[in-house]
Amino acid sequence: MQIRQWNKILIPYEQAVEELKVKFKGIRTELREINEYSPIEFVTGRVKTVSSILEKAKKYNVPDDQIEEKIEDIAGIRIMCQFVDDIYSVIELIRQRDEKDLKVLYEKDYLHNEKESGYRSYHVIIEYPVQTAYGQKKILAEIQIRTLAMNFWATIEHSLHYKYKENIPERIRERLKKAAEAAHRLDEEMWEIRDEVINAQKLFEVKSNTVSSIVNNIQLLNLIGRKGEAREFQEKFEALWEKGNVGDLKELLHTIKYVVARFQAFD
């Protein structure tokens, strides 16, 4: 295929990656906005380069005219989680969308069936409809769900595969396996303190959202000409901020909102 043809072929894949990133990031944002724990830590995505596609097609003897049907990861989404349990929560979120805005074709469980190299992850192969300028096009995409520790290890391993053209020296392979085991132990240790970590993060989110709302409402008082009240609340806020008590900050926010609503009603 000519380069010009490839550029045209890959456009729907680029669109799919951007749409899927927005959707999964949206889940994370929505949960955090309502102070709920999000199993999604962050999301990335990419479309394979033409050279990578051709290399994979050559490796698996895929004819040019079957590349889009046989190579499932031209479009790739990677979802990172803090804990192993979160991976299964994300998988369930994807399954719930089956036959809605995407179709789950099959899954690959490398958590319970890790690769010989030590690779761990969970892959979901989907069919995703893209609305193009020429009508709807259904494409294949791979969603990889893994922990931060798994992702760190996989990124290093991928770089070494690229450097050694998949012929990684045995001594490095052995060290990689040991590193994979260490990453697995780290995930297990983090799971043991999961509740404490989540509670701390929730508290941070609540405090952050409360402070942001207080500042916005004080600014609003200034905008509607209530500078004296704004200055008074600013001083109270600074005093409470030093103490760091979330309950006191919430109470202050409630009072400020009441005052703002009262003054706006008179305007």
What residue ranges belong to the model's regions?
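Extended, charge-rich alpha-helical segments
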Residues: 54-55, 64-70
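Generic alpha-helical secondary structure
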Residues: 9, 13, 17, 50, ...
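An acidic, glycine-/histidine-flanked metal-binding catalytic module
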Residues: 1-31, 141-267
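Surface-exposed, low-hydrophobicity interaction/linker segments
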Residues: 16-61
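Amphipathic alpha-helical interface elements
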Residues: 4, 11, 71, 80-85
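Solvent-exposed loop and beta-edge segments used for protein-protein assembly and interaction
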Residues: 16, 71-73, 118
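Long beta-strand-rich cores associated with HINT superfamily self-processing modules
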Residues: 68, 80-192
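A short, surface-exposed helix-loop junction/capping segment
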Residues: 1-4, 35, 67-76
